[in-house]
């Protein structure tokens, strides 16, 4: 497939900010078009509160006209609680138009000035990597299209995005403790009964956060709400902020007939040298809406995932071994000035072969990851 001119995320390295600098001057939408928030801080200078993030909307897409098989299966009568939980998780798979909105709603410090809100978007296919009785893994792949300067469609850009794993009644979790450190935590059998742990991984498959919660199935929607957890700053924040150290918050995933929604309720937290909370700057609300679409060309993402699936499967396995064997992990952002995601994306690109040597690849991945592990 080398003849194809589809671009992959290794070429742009913007990832969590969803190509903001790449598209900010796109002709798809006027930069002067109003962009609104409900919690808009109306007495603040409008220039200061102009949303940052991607201002383009990309190529037009068509929303799915019906709820589809996944929704029908989820709402079927006679299911056990666990069966319905599983169908709710699997309902997040498929083709979506995604929008991302984040805004600070409350400030807690003297002289507080609200930060500019964040908006962006994407077209994502969520692939089912694993579907087992007690474990489901979902991989997000972005396939983005923009109009070129002459109005013709440009080649799609492919970005391996985040991954979410779901395990039933999981008792071991590595939780974030600030300072790029994750520590093993355990739940009792009683605490884990009937609950699912969602593990969220970065684009390079390194851990981001893990949280336990319980699915609830209402008359016409299903939702999962997490316990409060710590998580590192996402790229949309650490690329522009250095005045706080961790997010403390909860997530809620809600499945609807037209797709699903992820809500975040975060506290932007300053930590002291010992990793304890010293100050909370603000509360942030976030909403990511995934609307099911139809008729979109996902071939670039399909082919990328097919070419690199073996490499990423080995990467997941190497990380799983670290998480199984180590009580504490400290992961550096960079090694010799190179971010981990950049190194891993380059390895994935160079490993696209039909006869991948799994043992050699495993050793190479382990050696690469070791460069980013802090032994101190």
Task: Give the positions of each predicted feature.
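Bacterial N-terminal signal peptides
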Residues: 10-18
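Hydrophobic/aromatic beta-strand elements that line small-molecule binding cavities or substrate pockets
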Residues: 114-116, 120-130, 139, 248-255, ...
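Bacterial N-terminal signal peptides that target proteins for export
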Residues: 2-10
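A short, structured loop/turn motif at beta-sheet edges
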Residues: 90-94, 128-134, 252-260, 292-297
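Generic short beta-strand segments
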Residues: 97-106, 141-144, 227-237, 263-271
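Short helix-loop boundary/capping segments
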Residues: 188-248
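Extended amphipathic alpha-helical segments with heptad-repeat/coiled-coil character used for oligomerization
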Residues: 130-176
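Amphipathic/hydrophobic helical signal segments and adjacent flexible N-terminal regions
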Residues: 27-91, 104-109, 114-116, 134-137, ...
């Amino acid at each position: 497939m080398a003849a194809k001119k589809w671009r992959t995320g290794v070429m742009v390295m913007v990832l969590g900010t969803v190509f903001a600098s790449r598209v900010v001057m796109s002709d798809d939408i006027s930069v002067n078009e109003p962009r609104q928030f409900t919690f808009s801080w109306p007495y603040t200078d409008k220039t200061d509160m102009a949303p940052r993030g991607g201002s383009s909307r990309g190529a037009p897409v068509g929303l799915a006209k019906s709820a589809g098989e996944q929704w029908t299966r989820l709402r079927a009568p006679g299911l056990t609680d666990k069966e319905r939980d599983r169908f709710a998780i699997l309902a997040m798979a498929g083709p979506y138009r995604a929008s991302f909105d984040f805004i600070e709603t409350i400030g807690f410090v003297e002289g507080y000035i609200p930060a500019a809100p964040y908006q962006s978007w994407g077209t994502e296919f969520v692939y089912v990597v694993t579907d087992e009785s007690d474990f489901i893994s979902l991989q997000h792949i972005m396939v983005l299209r923009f109009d070129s300067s002459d109005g013709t469609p440009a080649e799609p850009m492919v970005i391996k995005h985040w991954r979410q794993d779901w395990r039933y009644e999981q008792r071991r979790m590595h939780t974030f403790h600030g300072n790029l450190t994750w520590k093993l935590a355990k739940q009792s059998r009683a605490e884990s009964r009937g609950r699912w742990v969602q593990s969220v991984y970065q684009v390079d498959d390194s851990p981001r956060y893990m949280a336990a919660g319980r699915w609830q199935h209402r008359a016409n929607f299903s939702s999962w709400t997490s316990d409060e957890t710590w998580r590192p700053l996402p790229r949309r924040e650490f690329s522009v902020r250095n005045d706080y150290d961790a997010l403390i918050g909860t997530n809620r995933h809600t499945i609807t007939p037209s797709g699903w929604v992820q809500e975040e309720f975060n506290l932007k937290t300053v930590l002291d040298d010992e990793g304890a909370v010293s100050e909370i700057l603000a509360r942030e609300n976030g909403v990511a809406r995934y609307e099911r679409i139809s008729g979109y060309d996902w071939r670039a993402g399909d082919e990328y995932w097919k070419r690199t699936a073996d490499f990423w499967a080995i990467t997941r396995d190497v990380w799983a071994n670290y998480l199984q064997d180590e009580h504490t992990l400290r992961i550096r952002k960079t090694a010799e000035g190179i971010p981990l995601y950049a190194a891993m994306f380059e390895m994935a690109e160079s490993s696209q072969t039909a006869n991948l040597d799994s043992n050699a690849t495993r050793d190479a991945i382990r050696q690469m990851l070791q460069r980013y592990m802090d032994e101190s």
